[in-house]
Amino acid sequence: MRYGEICMQKFFIGEVIRKRRIELGLKQYELCEGICEPVTMSRLETGKQTPSYNKLKTILQRLGLPDDQCYMLLSKNEMLISDLQTEITSCNVLKDPERGLPKIEELEKIVEPDDTLTRQFILRSKASLGKKENGQIVPYTLNEKLDILFEAIRLTAPNFDIDAIYEGLYSIDEVKVINHIATVYSDLKQHKKAIDIYYQLLKYIRKHFQNILQSGGLLPLVAFNYARELDLTGRYTEAVEIAETGWKACVQYGQYYYLPSTIALIAECYHFLNQDEKSKTYYRQALYLFDAIDNKRGAKIIKSEIQKYFGTDFLV
């Protein structure tokens, strides 16, 4: 019986959590580290106390359990926090600090000091959107971003070791923080470090998030970033293999945001592997997808690559 089926039956959530925790050989304090006190964890498992929705969701994700079948009434403050997080996330994706930074300020005013999950989200968003200096919005330096992101991950994983990611337990948001750390190392030209992080993350996602539908976007994201690093370091055959893993995940989970870029990356790798006909085939697919979703920026980048590698020897 799968855990998704267990949650649908008449088991209270604490019983499901306790069963899975014991199955994984975890102590209560290990599971709830950075989220809540062990005594709260004990009360949760015995049905005597229910934590906030965000804390419960994080615990379930760390256990690799689906969190989409747990429903709770939210307080007014929790609803406001959730709404602000949704708006800020949109600003992160659209790279819109003008709208995002004021929303972060609003969130900071209402978050409780012991709400490590929301504080982690705030730090991650600041690393993405930047800061205000003398009335101007400026990005953080790469080293400042690293400091912010390590502070963020250690709010909920105090003993986090970037060289031993597999030793920890992480939620979806925690994996996003670690992924962001890897992108900063890449920007610092520390590609070997970034590759090691992505290797560990991909392994973790495959093992721990099989039952969590909401994690579907993580594998395409991490696989694309991992393949890009391999491409940058000339490991083209490996890059194709990882990119194809990301492609399959895009289709499996219905998460297509990274699909055109993933296919374009495969195309570039085949060019460097001296397989230009195969490369052109993949470039055409990527170009069609970028055009289909009206991603003019992506299409422009692809056309520039095609011109660079093939000149006029390319027919759409």
Sequence positions of predicted segments:
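A short, Lys/Arg-rich alpha-helix, primarily the initiator
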Residues: R2-E23
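Short alpha-helical DNA-recognition segment
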Residues: E23-R43
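DNA major-groove recognition helix of helix-turn-helix/homeodomain DNA-binding modules
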Residues: N54-Q69
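Amphipathic alpha-helical segments of tetratricopeptide repeats
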Residues: I104-V111, F150-D163, Y199-Q210, E244-Q255, ...
